[in-house]
Regions:
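Short amphipathic alpha-helical segments that mediate assembly, nucleic-acid/protein binding
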Residues: 19-22, 229-233, 254-258, 273
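Helix-loop-helix
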Residues: 223-224, 228-233, 238
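Short N-terminal helix-initiation segments at or just after the protein's N-terminus
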Residues: 234-239, 264-268, 306-312
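Long, charge-rich alpha-helical interaction segments
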Residues: 235-264
């Protein structure tokens, strides 16, 4: 069945704050003898575990930094997609503790929409996501789109969608330091360039034809993976508040110690990618099917890679070097990531079979255990069928 997607780009309204109380709180915060002000905004932010997920929650932490002391409280939870329902149930059980609940970079489905709509205080929840969504009519508190609201003809990410929301906030407007504003915008763009894999498609371009985000985006992701999460968030916040905000770039040939560390780690990652690709297992499948009254011979070639950590670079390099492969599966612990560069194949259909999701070219799902036999012929019959958008009754024989 054809996968149809209705994308909504609804404008979520601004954070609701009493401006008079905000000004009063700011004045009080300048007075040392005064006790801490009561919170004007109690926020919970639920997001994914990757760079885009943490990039979004870092923006909330930045927002809190510019509130008067004690005027905003923030609770964050970075989780796997399959934990969202349980997290929302717990959140709704304590909904009176929050004025605003933000969900970012976690795929929207009908179950989530129904859960939020059914709750009497569901209007406290704002959702920002860029994955494929099949829910036809999304409420106004959902911003779901694959397209960038800021950059024409570009793909977006959750960090950018959320940034587009909070930069209209009254408190954000109080950030008068233009260097800090530029740093935040640059950080958001680096996250977008990496999460959409835009940097990969421009890696062979002339350095004069692209901006520094294409260099800094993969370095930022490397930094994300080599640092403890709290260390990473702390480092990024310091970087964003610093007057020398270009510390991640190579502008005018000025290398910093962190740039060198990232380069060394990136070289290490490149060697790991090469090692993982050499371990790829090819799995050919041939099928005879009946569809639309005709006999079709399908011949798929799949590459399976078991890796310590999943990486789109591993899969995309594999597909680029092995043009005969129809799609590539990278298995890391109990996570399976699937990629394809063939226009006729939609790997998000594959991921849905196992309760996952994603995009046409890249998707993923979680399995309870990893075993090489999981990728045998019988297991992949339904995967092959779905990759070609076939019906189960169409399969006649498997050679």
């Amino acid at each position: 069945m054809e996968n149809t997607t209705n994308l909504q780009n609804n404008q979520v309204e601004n954070i609701s704050i009493d401006e008079a109380k905000l000004i009063e709180a700011m004045n009080k915060s300048l007075d040392e003898p005064e006790p801490p002000v009561s919170p004007l905004l109690r926020m919970k932010h639920i997001s994914h575990l990757d760079l885009d997920g943490y990039g979004s929650t870092i923006l909330s932490e930045i927002l809190m930094h510019f509130y008067p002391d004690g005027a905003m409280t923030l609770e964050t939870a970075n989780i796997l997609p399959n934990k969202l329902s349980a997290e929302m149930e717990e959140t709704f059980n304590n909904i009176d503790n929050y004025d605003l609940v933000v969900i970012t970079d976690l795929a929207v489905n009908q179950k989530l929409v129904d859960m939020i709509n059914a709750h009497p205080k569901g209007n406290k929840v704002k959702v920002f996501d860029h994955h494929l969504c099949e829910v036809a009519d999304l409420p106004s508190n959902f911003t779901v789109t694959e397209k960038s609201p800021i950059r024409e003809n570009k793909l977006t990410c959750a960090t950018e969608l959320y940034y587009n929301f909070i930069r209209n906030d009254k408190v954000y407007s109080l950030i008068h330091n233009q260097n800090i504003r530029k740093a935040i915008a640059y950080f958001v763009e680096c996250v977008r360039v990496y999460d959409t894999f835009e940097f990969w498609n421009t890696r062979n371009d002339s350095i004069n034809e692209i901006d520094m985000t294409y260099f800094d985006a993969p370095r930022l992701n490397t930094l994300f993976h080599i640092m403890d999460r709290d260390e990473f968030k702390s480092y990024i916040r310091e970087y964003l508040y610093s007057p020398n905000w270009e510390c991640l770039t190579q502008s005018n040939g000025n290398y910093t110690w962190i740039t060198k560390v990232l380069e060394l780690e990136q070289n290490k990652n490149e060697k790991y990618v090469e090692s993982a690709i050499r371990r790829m297992v090819r799995t050919p499948f041939k099928y005879t099917i009946y569809k639309d009254g005709k006999v079709h011979e399908l011949d798929y070639e799949i590459g399976v890679i078991f890796a310590e950590k999943s990486s789109p670079v591993i899969a995309n390099t594999t597909l680029e070097r092995n043009t005969d492969l129809d799609f590539c599966a990278v298995v890391s612990n109990n996570q399976v990531s699937i990629y394809s560069n063939k226009p006729e194949i939609d790997v998000s259909n594959i991921a849905k079979i196992f309760g996952g999701g994603g995009h046409k070219e890249a998707a993923g799902f979680t399995i309870p255990y990893v075993n090489a036999s999981i990728f045998n012929m019988q297991h992949f019959e339904k995967i092959i069928m779905c990759a070609g958008q076939l019906n189960e009754e169409d399969i006649c024989t498997a050679d």
